[in-house]
Amino acid sequence: MEQHIVLTKNLTKKFGKQTSVSGLEMKIKKGQIYGFLGPNGAGKTTTIRMLLGLIKPTKGDIQLFGQDIRKHRLQILRRIGSLVESPSYYGNLTGRENLEVIRRVRDLPEARIAEVLEIVRLSKVADRLAKEYSLGMKQRLGIAAALMSKPDLLVLDEPTNGLDPAGIHEIRELIKELPDQYGMTVLVSSHLLSEIDQMATQVGIIMNGKLIFQDDIEELRKKQKPLLKIGANNIHEAQSIIQKRGLHVKLQEGNLWISETSPEFVSEINGILVQSGVSVYRLEEVKRSLEDIFLELTGTEGSL
């Protein structure tokens, strides 16, 4: 039984003197949606290209379905569907005709076209020219093409990039259905934390070519321990009073932040500040977002 659909060891890719991916240890379980998260230029697409055999690693090993890609490349790739960057299609052919081209090349059953059109919800527009499709419909056509061979692993590189909110929602809901309804494992990359949060069951965060976090999405959410937000008339004096009691407090955007939020602690801190002549006008428990966790993990100050 395959423990991991994707398993890499010390996966590294250099372009000249520049290291794009460094020592990557990716582990993707069967039947999961693995969200591969990182800012543009972090190494996501380079990693995906290595997994698909499009470029060779500088060093390291790649196992897909328990097999070494160097020894069983063609056998492995038959079990993978992919959409890397933008979809490829013939604009002067209909959506159905585009899939017919793929069906003939791969010698697939004719019925498969109708099946994938239904999966990606393009059945009603299947006979329109592909060049007349919206960007979201073109993305779904690209996913349909990737699904033609009934892959065990579907690899999608930034599938929601450039889409409007409605298009993003359509792609997200489509991806979420694939493991349960069709038994697929999905690797989806994105620079949008909110997208990964809403559809992934596993997450890997890559930064400057290095995987800095990898676990179930729930483990990432467990890091969302709430903080106590304090607003006071003399914020610097309040900070000094709290620090003198040996507590770690952070001043940010005119408010103090403390990691302890128990009712007893909040009451005690409020009493200490008031007795010291500090007028407290805000005591608020704030749950940290996943973006806050990302910034903490990466040590960056900006958003994805």
Predicted regions and their residues:
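ABC transporter nucleotide-binding domain
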Residues: 172-260
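ABC transporter nucleotide-binding domains
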Residues: 3-8, 13-188, 193-207, 211-213
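Phosphate/oxyanion-binding loops and surfaces in catalytic or ligand/nucleic-acid-binding neighborhoods
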Residues: 105, 300-301
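Short, Lys/Arg-enriched, disordered terminal segments
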Residues: 1-4, 301-304
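Short, charged/small-residue-rich alpha-helical element at the C-terminal edge
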Residues: 228-297, 304
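Residues at or immediately preceding the N-termini of alpha-helices
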Residues: 69, 73, 217, 235, ...
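Generic structural signal for individual residues within well-ordered alpha-helical segments
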Residues: 77, 99-100, 114-117, 169, ...
